[in-house]
Amino acid sequence: MFLLLIILQALAVAIAQSQGDHKIIGGYRCVRNSQPWQVALQAGPGHRFLCGGVLLSDQWVITAAHCARPILHVALGKHNIRRWEATQQVVRVARQVPHPQYQPQAHDNDLMLLKLQKKVRLGRAVKTISVASSCASPGTPCRVSGWGTIASPIARYPTALQCVNVNIMSEQACHRAYPGIITSGMVCAGVPEGGKDSCQGDSGGPLVCGGQLQGLVSWGMERCAMPGYPGVYANLCNYHSWIQRTMQSN
């Protein structure tokens, strides 16, 4: 029985790892600029879309630690990811600060702060959001946004920013779905019947509950939105002090 549990846990870890540059299914097109804290991370000199992110101040963005790359830019004020837009701003990342206890294989402590090369201009299409200082209770309604695939397992990527409404799941439900893997640095969100989820390409994007940033898209099953397998997010309420301290000291 113990060996079987080890095998099942190892399989679950392998499934989580297989997502790579992870993770909207069952959602809808966001109203233009309704998520003004949403950031698109771009990698390399070619500015290839990589991940989502969230604007915390006029010079700091937060995203998933597994989105780290040697060269990063952030695009803000975006709706259509493939077109130039009058509201957009693109700024190079000057410094990447992953959480010091980030564990890539387990996706634990999967968060990273990005200091921008210059301050961004705040306005109607570009706004900051506060990190939640207290954890959300099970059943709390939340919204996730991103430019990740809208179909799974065969990927189909949108041009416009997508939103999906999900609920915070209980710790028990989260542990049942992923036994032996979930830590205090993670929180699950979804719907019991499945069909609504973040997915590949949404990584680092916001889980917003009650107007506060509660989580970042981190990992999940390779096939998204499956019943009984919610998405897993970095549980930012447990990192509030580290986030504030890091931004103030850098």
UniProtKB/Swiss-Prot annotation:
Q: Where is the Peptidase S1 domain?
A: 24-248
Q: How is it modified after translation?
A: Proteolytic cleavage of the activation peptide produces the active enzyme.
Source superkingdom? Eukaryota
Instruction: Cite the CDD domains for this sequence.
Output: Tryp_SPc (cd00190)
Q: Which cystines does this chain contain?
A: 51-67, 142-209, 174-188, 199-224
Maturation propeptide residues: 19-23
- Active-site residues (renumbered): 66, 110, 203
**Where in or outside the cell is it found?**
Secreted, Extracellular space
What's the EC number here?
A: 3.4.21.-
What top-level class of enzyme does the UniProt entry assign? hydrolase
| Residues in the signal sequence | 1-18
Q: Quote the cellular component terms of the Gene Ontology held in the record.
A: extracellular space
Q: Name one Pfam family in it.
A: Trypsin
Q: Which Gene3D superfamilies match?
A: Trypsin-like serine proteases (2.40.10.10)
Activity regulation = Inhibited by SERPINA1, SERPINC1, SERPINE1, SERPINF2, aprotinin, soybean, trypsin inhibitor and leupeptin. Inhibited by serine protease inhibitor SPINK5. Has an autoproteolytic activity which may have a regulatory effect. Activated by citrate and inhibited by zinc and to a lower extent by manganese.
The biological processes this protein is annotated with in GO are: epidermis morphogenesis; fertilization; negative regulation of G protein-coupled receptor signaling pathway; positive regulation of G protein-coupled receptor signaling pathway; proteolysis; seminal clot liquefaction
For this UniProt record, the keywords arranged alphabetically read as follows: Disulfide bond, Hydrolase, Protease, Secreted, Serine protease, Signal, Zymogen
Q: Give a GO molecular function annotation for the protein.
A: serine-type endopeptidase activity
Q: Which residues cross the membrane?
A: none
Entry's family note: Belongs to the peptidase S1 family. Kallikrein subfamily.
What does this gene product do? Serine-type endopeptidase with a dual trypsin-like and chymotrypsin-like substrate specificity. May activate/inactivate the proteinase-activated receptors F2R, F2RL1 and F2RL3 and other kallikreins including KLK1, KLK3, KLK5 and KLK11. May function in seminal clot liquefaction through direct cleavage of the semenogelin SEMG1 and SEMG2 and activation of KLK3. May function through desmoglein DSG1 cleavage in epidermal desquamation a process by which the most superficial corneocytes are shed from the skin surface.
Q: What is this protein called?
A: Kallikrein-14
Provenance organism: Mus musculus
